[in-house]
A protein has these predicted regions:
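ABC-type ATPase nucleotide-binding domains, specifically the catalytic core motifs of the NBD
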Residues: 2-4, 26-43, 54, 167-168
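ABC ATPase NBD coupling module
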Residues: 1-18, 24, 154-158
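Conserved ABC ATPase signature
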Residues: 64-68, 72
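Conserved ABC ATPase "signature" region
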Residues: 42-60, 108-111
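Catalytic Walker B motif of ABC-type/P-loop ATPase nucleotide-binding domains
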Residues: 89-93
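Conserved catalytic motifs of ABC-family nucleotide-binding domains
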Residues: 85
Length: 171
């Protein structure tokens, strides 16, 4: 129940399912957060440029964020998330409303979060989008954990199949 700024200071980053970018350029979306979190103008610019490169946003740097596609917005949001150097990142439906090609792209960027030293926790209703990128999964239902383990273990869980995937699900 802590306010967002205290969660950020505690090393927790959060990516909302909703579009959450400022109505300014891609570059300024990143630089603005850098100015709040990083000391020194040269360090702020360096981090902004690094994130533009790392998340393939360099060609969009001067584009107004409201003109970005869903996948481009997700990449910008993921990049912004890293500015405060969180140790834990919470992603809420990070691939919601994205087409299959963009989902694959976002999966690669989610995997990159580990390169920044982040533990990643993802909530998503479309678990098929996650099976290739997670080490462990938990299926929740009936107000408790109904299955947990590796992807293979989850797919063998009769309770997960019955209550979440449905009887016609084929792995």
């Amino acid at each position: 129940n802590k306010p967002i700024h205290l969660r950020a200071k505690a090393g927790i980053g959060y990516l909302s399912q909703q579009r959450s970018v400022f109505a300014i350029s891609v570059y300024d979306n990143l630089l603005g957060i850098c100015q709040l979190c990083i000391k020194g103008t040269s360090n702020q610019i360096k981090m902004t440029e690094q994130l533009l490169d790392e998340f393939n946003l360099q060609h969009l740097r001067d584009i107004h964020a409201s003109n970005l596609s869903g996948g481009e917005v997700r990449r910008l949001m993921l990049a912004r998330l890293l500015i405060n150097k969180p140790s834990i990142v919470l992603l809420d439906e990070p691939m919601a409303a994205l087409d299959p090609i963009v989902v694959q792209e976002i999966q690669k960027y989610i995997l990159k979060l580990q390169n920044f030293g982040c533990a990643v926790l993802i909530t998503d209703h479309q678990v098929n989008n996650l099976f290739d990128i997670v080490d462990r999964a938990y299926v929740l239902g009936e107000q408790s954990i109904i299955a947990q383990g590796t992807t293979a273990e989850i797919l063998k869980s009769s309770k997960a199949i019955e209550l979440y995937f449905g009887p016609s699900y084929r792995a």
